[in-house]
Amino acid sequence: MYNLAHRILKKLDPELSHNISIKALKLGIYPKIICKNTEILEQTIWGRTFKTPIGLSAGFDKNAEVINPILNLGFSFTELGTVTPLPQKGNSKPRIHRFPAQKALINSLGFNNKGMDVFERNINNSNLKENFQDKIIGINIGNNKDTVEILDDLKKLFDRLYRLGDYIVINLSSPNTPGLRDNLKSQNFEKIVTNIHRLRDENNSKIPILFKISPDISDQDKKDISLISLANDVDGLILTNTTVNKSMVNEKLEGGVSGLSLIHI
């Protein structure tokens, strides 16, 4: 069954394949996998126990539409988003391109999502506390494309969503939002870190906050980010988003490359 579905989906447009997968999960067309918990795979981070190290990263379930089905597939955690305050269509299509020979994809999606109102409602409707008490939920947040001050959007998102997840991710790494990666420069990064931590304190919250970074930053930026993170007790960094280095796929398409290319960075 899986092999047949996989062959069919690979023949279709990549974004259409993704949308079909979401619809299939919504309809319950997937195998429910019963996993036996093995203590040797467990890891406790920030006081939260991850049953296994296998989870689903942000980008698949952008709108928190299929939380329960994803966790029923056996993942110990899922990261939802990236979500922005307002709905956003993203960049023009086609915006996902496959390169099977190179085991790579290029995407220029641009934070396409239905916005935080729909996102919040979907999480509340999933009854996570009743269905998956032992699972971990991450919430990945980012700014709208036309936002002038990124902290304004991050504040809106944090205030609305921090109670709904086990950890928050600040996405500063997408190459498909103009100017976003500039926030990884030391002065900008430190400003965001200190302001987000202050916002957490103002809400009397202890939720872990992670920052997702780019693979394309300079060695000096890597050093600066590391030192700033240590100095400010950052809970974690997520390495990494897609790269704009297209040497392995030899393409002039807009967007970021994921897949095998990242191993060599």
Region roles according to the model:
Residues F50, A58-D61, L71, N112-K129, ...:
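Conserved alpha/beta-domain cores
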Residues V66-P85:
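Active-site cofactor/substrate anionic-group-binding motifs, chiefly glycine-
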Residues Y2-Q43, N107-N112, M116:
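An N-cap/entry alpha-helix motif that binds or orients negatively charged groups
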Residues T84-K89, V244-K246:
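Short gly/pro/ser/thr-enriched loop/turn and capping motifs at secondary-structure boundaries
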Residues I263-I265:
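Conserved small/polar residues in nucleotide/adenosyl-binding loops
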Residues V66-I70, Q88-R95, E149-L151:
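Short, conserved acidic/polar surface loops in the N-terminal third of protein domains
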